[in-house]
From Swiss-Prot:
Predominant location category: membrane
PANTHER family attached to this UniProt entry: PROTON PUMP-INTERACTOR 1, RNA-BINDING PROTEIN YLMH-RELATED
Annotated function: May regulate plasma membrane ATPase activity.
Gene that encodes the chain: BIP131
Protein's UniProt name: Proton pump-interactor BIP131
Claim: Transmembrane helix is one of the keywords in the record: yes
Residue spans of biased composition, Low complexity class: 430-441
Source lineage: Eukaryota, Viridiplantae, Streptophyta, Embryophyta, Tracheophyta
Induction and repression of expression: Induced by brassinolide.
Keyword Coiled coil among record annotations: yes
Organism: Oryza sativa subsp. japonica
Keywords of the record: Cell membrane, Coiled coil, Membrane, Transmembrane, Transmembrane helix
Start-end of Basic and acidic residues biased regions: 374-387, 448-516
């Protein structure tokens, strides 16, 4: 058990905490303040505060109490020291969580810098876009001004055009002048005076002459209007030239405005692209912030766990601070009472709780090792090993998940067992693997464990990070899916090849059946040779059909027996007959081909007759 000592006088309290003092000595300087000088013992004279030696001070002391003061009474109290303890696994997790948090913070800062760069780029584009927008606005104002200027001229031209159209509409069906009207009436009278026309024709001409005489006033009026319109031709030409000139100016302004608008469109497209990138970076920043907050929460949880494990140490620090305050105030009885209560409380917990004893033993290991003591507090023997292994930090458990999954992947990628391997060979091959697996826990247990008093739950395997485990599972699923797709593709290819071979065989079979039917039809006048050839062909077809039929799955041993039985038979093999060249006469296929050629010639002749003789005759009629 490790304790801290405390010494206290009536005017001060001194406490010792291990090698360091728990309480600071506080000397009473009332006498020095009253005299205003510092006393130096062991010298022959007394030096004042300003460095001069006083003659009055060289005189012998007047009182014996000043010469031989009473020794100060010192009170010593001992408190049980509670050390802080850092769990190696928890410390490794804290370091790993801190690294992850720093990585997340750096990643977020990189995204934030990229976002700031994109925003500055967007502001630069906007600064380039503002003068172009102002220039476009000026061009719009110029175009609108010219359009306002050309509007009254277009109205006047429209007025002239409407008057001309109205005059043309009124003069539709009328003569353009009086001379033309008189000439037309004269021509009609000449036709009437001609004796060869009929009475009806003469009446019609007389009626037409009357109608023309009735339109004389309208013709005169239209002629006057036309003369008036001719007077405004110069004015219309001037207005038209003005409109044309203004239109040319508008076209030039529109051309310049279109160039500015093209630049504006390019910049707007750039702004839209930058806005999309900014939105994507903003989403990434939100996700990075969420990841950073999650990592920081995990780090805080681990810190809370560490602080929760060191609750007794924090209580000890609080008690030490209160003892320091009481000793500074000189309250000896309060310090004594507090010391008694704390010691009784500690001993009660020590006697009643085994977990408390184990926790305390773990906490003082570092202190015992620094003072070269053994686990039970005695001096360490020369041949005794130090207990420094207790404080070593275990390596992080996140480095081990990758090799743990390799055997599973290798087992998946390993080829299937061959058919010639017997079960006995498989058992013999599996035996060394089982022996190696059985030796692995022995090797792990052979490692010297210094924590003999710790509970066995600390010997559990290091935990695998859930994120990495999920990633490895996802990779395994992807590989499984790839293998399944490859298997399906191979199966589909095999099925397609089988279907193609089956279709080819069926086509060959149908072709052979057609040839056989044709030979039977044409072989009505054949002799014995043709009959023998037909029989041989039939036999060959039957043999080939038997060969094309899918053979039933038969083992190798049965095939060997079948071959042995066949070799023992005395009957000749049918292969010589099957491979014999088929004899086919010329007349078996020449007659159908000749009939087909004759039919084609007749059809071609009918088509030519219809195209060149029948159709022209029908169109001429």
């Amino acid at each position: 058990m490790e304790a801290t000592g405390a010494e206290a006088t009536l005017s001060q309290v001194t406490a010792v905490d291990g090698e360091d003092n728990l309480f600071q000595d506080k000397e009473s300087r009332a006498t020095a303040k009253e005299r205003g000088e510092a006393a130096v013992f062991g010298l022959e004279n007394i030096v004042t505060a300003n460095g001069a030696t006083s003659a009055a001070d060289l005189a012998p002391p007047k009182d014996v109490v000043d010469e031989w003061p009473e020794p100060k009474q010192t009170h010593t109290f001992f408190f049980v020291r509670i050390c802080s303890y850092e769990d190696p696994s928890l410390k490794a997790k804290l370091e790993q969580a801190d690294k992850e948090c720093q990585k997340k913070i750096q990643a977020r800062s990189h995204i934030f810098e990229a976002l700031r760069t994109k925003r500055s780029e967007r502001s630069n584009i906007i600064s380039e876009l503002k003068p172009l927008a102002a220039e476009n606005k000026q061009y719009n104002e110029v175009v609108s001004g010219k359009l306002k200027e050309i509007e009254p001229l277009q109205k006047s031209l429209g007025k002239f055009r409407s008057e001309n159209n109205a005059m043309r509409a009124q003069g539709a069906g009328l003569c353009s002048s009086i001379e033309e009207l008189d000439q037309l009436i004269k021509s009609l009278n000449d036709r009437i005076s001609h004796e060869s026309i009929s009475l009806d024709e003469e009446k019609r001409l007389v009626k037409e002459i009357k109608q023309l005489n009735g339109t004389r006033s309208k013709v005169i009026e239209n002629a006057a209007k036309r003369a008036k319109m001719q007077d405004t031709v110069v004015e219309r030409g001037t207005i038209h030239d003005q409109v044309k000139q203004i239109g040319v100016g508008i076209d030039e302004v529109k051309r310049d405005r279109q160039a500015v608008r093209d630049k504006i469109k390019v910049l707007e497209d750039q702004i839209h692209a930058v806005d999309g990138e900014i939105a994507a970076l903003q989403d990434d920043l939100t996700a990075a912030t969420a990841r950073k907050d999650k990592a920081f929460e995990a780090l805080n949880e681990l810190r809370k766990t560490r602080d929760l494990n060191n609750t007794s140490f924090h209580q000890y620090r609080t008690i030490s601070n209160s003892v320091r305050d009481l000793s500074a105030r000189g309250e000896v009885e309060a310090v004594q009472q507090l010391c008694q209560n704390e010691v009784e409380k500690f001993m009660a917990q020590w006697c009643s709780s085994k977990s408390f004893r184990e926790d305390y033993e773990k906490r003082i290991l570092v202190s015992l090792n620094s003072r070269q003591l053994s686990r039970d507090g005695r001096m360490r023997n020369p041949d005794e090993k130090p207990i420094v292994l207790e404080t070593q930090v275990a390596p992080p458990a996140e480095q081990e998940p990758a090799p743990l999954k390799k055997p599973a992947k290798q087992a998946k990628e390993a080829p299937a067992p061959r058919a010639d391997v017997t079960p006995k060979d498989e058992i013999r091959a599996k035996a060394p693997a089982k022996a190696a697996k059985a030796k692995q826990p022995l090797d792990i247990d052979d490692i010297p464990d210094v924590h003999d008093d710790e509970p066995p739950k600390e010997k559990t395997k290091p935990k695998v990070d859930e994120a990495k485990l999920k990633e490895m599972k996802r990779q395994e699923e992807i590989e499984k899916n790839k293998l399944a797709l490859e298997r399906k593709k191979k199966q589909a290819e095999k099925q397609a090849m089988k279907a193609a071979a089956r279709a080819e065989k069926e086509a060959e079979k149908k072709l052979k059946e057609k040839e056989k039917k044709a030979r039977k039809r044409s072989a009505t006048a054949g002799g014995a040779e043709s009959e023998e050839a037909a029989e041989s062909d039939a036999k060959s077809d039957e043999a080939e059909a038997q060969e094309e039929e899918p053979a039933a799955p038969v083992t190798i041993k049965k095939n060997a027996r079948h071959r042995s039985t066949v070799t023992k038979t005395k009957t000749p093999l049918p292969k010589a007959v099957l491979k014999r060249k088929k004899s086919q006469a010329f007349w078996s296929w020449g007659a159908p081909m000749a009939a087909l050629a004759a039919a084609l010639v007749a059809l071609l002749g009918a088509l030519v007759y219809y195209q060149y003789y029948y159709l022209p005759a029908s169109t001429s009629n």
